[in-house]
Curated annotation (Swiss-Prot):
Predicted to be exported by the Tat system. The position of the signal peptide cleavage has not been experimentally proven. GO terms for biological process: proteolysis. Residues 405-415 have a biased composition (Gly residues). Residues 127-400 form the Peptidase S8 domain. This is Halolysin. It comes from Haloferax mediterranei (strain ATCC 33500 / DSM 1411 / JCM 8866 / NBRC 14739 / NCIMB 2177 / R-4) (Halobacterium mediterranei). It comes from the Archaea.
Amino acid sequence: MAGTPNFDRRSFLRLAAAAGLTGMAGVTSATPGRSPGPKKDEILVGVTSTADSPRKAVADAVPGNAEIVHENETLSYAAVKFPSKAPKQARENFISAITKRDEVKYAEKNATHEALYTANDPKYGSQYAPQQVNADSAWDTTLGSSSVKIAVVDQGVKYDHPDLSSQFGSNKGRDFVDNDGDPYPDLLSDEYHGTHVAGIAAGTTDNNEGIGGISNSTLLSGRALSESGSGSTSDIADAIEWAADQGADVINLSLGGGGYSSTMKNAVSYATQQGSLVVAAAGNDGRQSVSYPAAYSECVAVSALDPDETLASYSNYGSEIDLAAPGTNVLSCWTTSTEYNEISGTSMATPVVSGVAGLALAVHNLSPADLRNHLKNTAVDIGLSSTKQGSGRVDAANAVTTDPGDGGGGGGGGSKETTYDGTLSSSSDSNCVSHSWNYSSPSQVVIDLSGPSSADFDLYATEGSGTCPTTRSYDYRSWSYDSTEQIVIDNPDTSADLGILVDSYSGSGSYTVTITEKE
């Protein structure tokens, strides 16, 4: 965010490397009959904000046997579909040709995603996740607030479940798989993941029914995965954009894996700019590699713990991890007659963090960046390395009872802001800034870029080397479809000046870089 957006405390799934909506702001209609679920024959083309529209920007480059089947004007991309029998080289040739255009920022395959995995509630005694994060102590202060919205981008949610029905308002959500206004699961026997996730985050607590969720927040369901547990990058990105536009304070992404996607990056960047905290699962491969989208700097990356607070054997880990939470054998809502079930995964740890975020927002009015910092500052060190626990195990009681101005356990809570103004005269023009640190050991630095809406400026940073980044050599990068960018660095290396590059991908004009160091 270039500057904190105005707001009023509004209120995993595995990615395979294979890689519509109507009547919503910024999204034009998809081609009628576009198949739901995986879209392996599609290429997503991202364009600059200066293009008339994504469709117009790429139309004359589309081969005769292909067609534009979808566009999202807010995220500035179009989906181009090739015949299923078209040779792989045809798609590769298209990507090579289209990315040479000045108005095109990227072209990538439309990836396929697959699902991974003292209150009076009768089953509360069979739970351990709320107790492990001290939710019961937090509930002495607040059970949560209906003014806080948590969006679950996942499979559909069984919103008439007895532990979920009161958490949904008149707007239940939207189905991005079938392209309609009802996010209810198509096949209850197979489509349980979203319901389980929703129950962990915000199943109704203290209602003499079933389990206790972490926070009594309002739920929104963005159905972007079908009953088969798979979905496309475009459907998930559109659902993230929609959730942000609906005023979601927290967007839960119990999905991820695979590689970097510019379309998904733009979606989580947009959501953050709109005032949403995006919480994502680290991945279930049991290796040192945090999956996307959790690895994006905008997302809170969550690893999974066993009941004894050791890292779960399946949980991914790495330097991008922000927080850890219980994820093994977590009891929550189910879609069949049993109504409740235990499953494991970073998918289950993620909504624990989302629920704690909901509790914190019921008490504290925080921006996404400040909420993220607050959750990390109030986390409990459980003795794991930072690559496994991040700042620690999320703690609901600390998040609710600690004044954000106190900085929790992570410093004095103060901050210092420095601004740098500049002008870029044309495309490919760039300026470098060398920033001297105000604090010797800040807990976090946030770099915001605000530039002209008619241009497309990108932001790069290096730490610990004292060198200026380039568009090819950098430690951090934020590049979306406009000139509003943000980089967040936790516990930055202050042994040398911070290097910052502002680069014009297209257009010209004045900009401001704001650097906020937090104690």
